[in-house]
């Protein structure tokens, strides 16, 4: 990937990724993706490829749900963070409740581990974020700015 900090007259907030794809086997990644996606392994690999090659393409929301412990959910989220580096952020309910969101609103992936939706407003906020086309970003001491949100 050819990362550019400025595209035309716009600042590119996407962070460069420090590793490049290479030919060869990837048994550990294949095993993890196969474990998470099961029969939908090819879909999972396509999803990861699209995230890498077309980061601005709107993709479906992934939701990993299991009442069982030690199923690999957190391991998969950590893998996504290692793969996409600074373009991934881990959020908690408090992050979504804060009026200041500039640190996460422009990320490729916003991952949430062990979310507890005890308040109706939390689930409504997540529902809104997962379906909206644009979102207002706010940083401390700065005006709100509307961005495309995918």
Model-derived segments and their meaning:
Residues 2-111, 123-126:
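P-loop NTPase catalytic core of nucleic-acid-dependent motor ATPases
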Residues 119-121:
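Active-site-adjacent loop/helix micro-motif of nuclease/hydrolase catalytic cores
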